[in-house]
Amino acid sequence: MSCFSRTFLAASISAALFAPQIQAEASVDDNRAQLPNGEQCLVNQPEPTNPGQQPINVEADKLEAINGQKATYSGNVVVVQGKKRIAADNVTLHQQENVVVAEGNVQFSDGEIKTHSTKATNHLNTDEMTLENTRYQFLCEPGRGEAVYVSKTGKAVYEIEDGSITSCPDGDNAWRMRASSIDVDQNEEIATFYNPRLEVQNVPVFYLPYLTVPIGDTRKTGFLYPTASYGSRNGYSFEVPIYWNLAPQYDLETTFNYMQKRGTQLNSVFRYLTDFGAGQIKSEYLADDQLHTELGDRWAFQYEHNGIFQQAWKFEIDYSKVSDINYFSDLDSGVGNREDGQLIQEGRATYRSDNWDSALLVRDFQLLTKDTTSTNLPYRLMPQLSYNYYAPETMKYLDLDLVSHVSRFETDARGKPSATRVHIEPGLKIPFSNTWGNWTTEARVLGTYYQQDLDKTTDAKLEESVTRVIPEIRSVAGIVLERDTVLLDDYTQTLEPKIQYLYVPEKYQDNIGLYDSTLLQTDYYGLFRSRKYSGVDRIESANQVSYGASTRFFDSNYKERLNIAFGQIFYLDSKLNPSNKNPDSTSDKTSYSAWAVEMDFNFADYLFYHGGIQYDIDSQAVQLGNSTLEYRVASGYIQANYRYVAKDYIRNTVGDSITNIDDITRDGISQAGILAGYQLSRKWSASGQYYYDLTTDEALEWLANLTYTSDCWYVGFTYSNQLKSWNGNFVTDPYATPIYENNFSFNIGIIGFGTSIGAGSSMTGVDSAGNSLGYGRPFFLNN
């Protein structure tokens, strides 16, 4: 063997050029550096100033040279220059042209691609290369293929004639794209196909005259790889997405979604970035739905914006609208934020300073129910102007603040008034705190003025003009005690007792409508809030002491493993206890609220539990409760959950805003569910969920997913069965029957070249198939 290392090709073979034929030395210098094997991605390595001047190393069994013209190496030939490596049976070096021609079992790599060809020609000065009858594989991106002719015309730029490309590994021809010509630019991460056809297991499935696709993660205009699916709701579906890189600050993705039973839907997402923030516009349009011809064209639209301008202004917009109320139940859609059967339509502009902020808010909605005049419809906010002032540490241990807003409420609800509300709320706070405890005393004055339009109002208690002033005094204190546990080694336990006194005088408020006030969640932490409602239309009177404690356990790494909290309210005025407001209650009046208990548990990071309960000792009844238990390992999880709300509790807490409780629920809420997901093997995974209503003895929903994921494609199967409505009133009619919607679907798609697993494949979560209930982790330990 012989090894040559010079600064220029001519110098590397100069000794051989003086003789017409020479036998290369058979000995090898074992101390020389190991030559690179060409199997690594080297595209990000810095390039030399003059690549053609790099040293060349040649290994061969035999060398023949013609003076001043060429040198021919044969027998186990390896030529290395910088990142380029050629191995072949024969290699000819043309000195004058600085060209290498390799023939016979040619293997080439340059840190970006490796190939196996019958012949290769490399122009060392220009970095140009041609390959014939080639199998190739990219080293910096997933991808391989075959070609009759491959030409490299620049750094990471390739032209492929009569070739194919796939992201599948060697030996797997599940799919490939064939074309008469393919241009691949790894710098731009884009591939251009001429006369392409997609083959699945060597069978052509579609043809296009021209196609560009991205082959990386950067933004490039072109087709994204399509997905195919079948569902009992829409029949066969085929989606072809196209990405448009319009400018550095905005782009567009359009998707043609063909549905066998409905027609072709055009979906688009336009994204932008400006000095005022970032946003996106989503649209979906289905011309003349063939499954529901009476509905005609069906569409959906959403505009979202969120941004900060000049560090003081913040702009937020979320506006959604659909063509009809059944749009989301008939079509899979990613448009809109839905709450309680409504599409949110709101915009907010906020200005913030060091000590104050002001905001203008407009909120509307689109109802997704048939009843557009019900008395339970929410109010539109048209608009609300707020101003808040903060003066922390005005003096030592003294904070001042002011909350104020002017709001206009409008509604289409039958018998409900519109109104203008002005609210001013100054506050004073005296905080004390140290490492082991805190004590805060707060005083506020809530002044509110209402001008109510009563023309269409049926509630005789309401008054046109109302002025309400209510003081509020609150004092809350807590301490943190800590010790090393006795029974558990290396564990630390805390005990955190807490107490609060709250006084709000009783004030007649039945002459005021409910505009934006909703009941806040009631749990252990809610015992120590000053407000029962989120808005100011109802200021719940109070003369009460809340007390409770929590204890936490931390392991040696100070990771929280167990948290138990319990507490109760003692009403100094028993008539203020909500439990005493039910006229149908037969129990004696009590001065105590139900006990609220919360518990979170994490055992060895694989068994998790969260539970909460409110138990009324006087009535010996559970008012509400929830419980979640989850077992999780690296390959999957199983979770069981249950929630319960007593009907009397619903009546006592929200009876003012919902008057037809007896028509909505028979025995309150009692629902159980189980969810599971498991990686069956490296390629197979499954997930599912089941929810059951114990008050109606009917299933709410069940869903099952099964997915196969290979290295370059996936297929997902989904079956769902959802309770959509009832034939009759299930509360009052014993013969009412449930109406279910069944749907089976499968999705198939490509992985690689910048694509990922699609929605609905069952790999993006058990809630990816449009089901209303999904997986969540309601565990609140500090981990």
From Swiss-Prot:
Stored Pfam families: LptD (PF04453), LptD_N (PF03968)
Function text: Together with LptE, is involved in the assembly of lipopolysaccharide (LPS) at the surface of the outer membrane.
Record-given protein name: LPS-assembly protein LptD
Organism lineage: Bacteria, Pseudomonadati, Pseudomonadota, Gammaproteobacteria, Vibrionales
Family per similarity comment: Belongs to the LptD family.
GO cellular component terms given for this protein: cell outer membrane; transporter complex
One of the GO biological process terms: Gram-negative-bacterium-type cell outer membrane assembly
Superkingdom per UniProt: Bacteria
InterPro entries the UniProt entry points to: LipoPS_assembly_LptD, LptD, LptD_C, OstA-like_N
Protein's organism: Vibrio cholerae serotype O1 (strain ATCC 39315 / El Tor Inaba N16961)
Main subcellular location: membrane
Entry-linked Gene3D superfamilies: Lipopolysaccharide (LPS) transport protein A like domain (2.60.450.10)
